[in-house]
Regions:
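Short loop/turn motifs at secondary-structure junctions and domain boundaries
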Residues: 34, 117-118
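A solvent-exposed, acidic/Ser-Thr-rich amphipathic alpha-helical stretch
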Residues: 21-22, 27, 40-97, 102-104, ...
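Short beta-strand edge/turn micro-motifs at domain boundaries
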Residues: 2-7, 119-144
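Beta-strand elements of well-folded, non-transmembrane domains
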Residues: 105-111, 126-128
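A short, acidic/glycine-rich surface segment
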Residues: 11-12, 85, 108-113
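A short local loop/turn or secondary-structure capping micro-motif enriched for an aromatic residue
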Residues: 62, 108-110, 143-144
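Short, low-complexity N-terminal intrinsically disordered segments enriched in polar/charged residues
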Residues: 1-49
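Residue-level signal for well-ordered, solvent-exposed loop/turn and beta-edge residues enriched
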Residues: 52, 114, 132-134
Length: 144
């Protein structure tokens, strides 16, 4: 069941907005740290069951657990994978309790013994579902 941020009065909106932003920020950094573990199950647990993933290194839109698993099985297999978040901006939807976070990150990994550096931009949507912040949308593309 999807839970939104509480529908606050004008006086409490700022506090509620800050709490929502803090939850989404923590979820974003948890995602980056979990990617570095290269544990597919742990990464997938950060996504809502109906989340949409438009991944960095694939042209296929992933909209179910099996398709997201297929992508992360391949992506997380890269040796030494880390994700460094450089910049992000965020906003809270006043109606839906959804937090949108967009920014820039860099993936670094080794492929065939050669270090690969992939600067990318991202857009995540997070929602509080069953008392945890989950990814409901994730778009990532290589920087132009």
């Amino acid at each position: 069941m999807t839970e939104t941020c509480p529908n606050p009065t004008i006086e409490t909106y700022a506090d509620t907005e800050l709490a929502c932003l803090a939850g989404a920020k923590a979820a974003l950094y948890r995602w980056a740290a979990t990617v570095a573990t290269r544990d597919v199950d742990q990464v997938l647990a950060l996504y809502a069951p109906d989340a949409i993933l438009v991944p960095t290194l694939s042209n296929q839109v992933r909209d179910c657990d099996d398709s997201r698993r297929n992508y992360f099985d391949n992506f997380l297999a890269n040796d030494g994978l880390v994700c460094d978040i450089q910049v992000f901006k965020k906003r809270v939807s006043r109606k839906l309790g959804t937090v949108v976070v967009g920014g820039l990150y860099t993936f670094v990994y080794r492929q065939a013994g050669v270090q690969q550096v992939v600067p990318a931009r991202f857009l995540f949507t997070f929602e509080r579902i069953d008392d945890q912040w989950l990814i409901t949308g994730h778009h990532s593309s290589i920087e132009a």
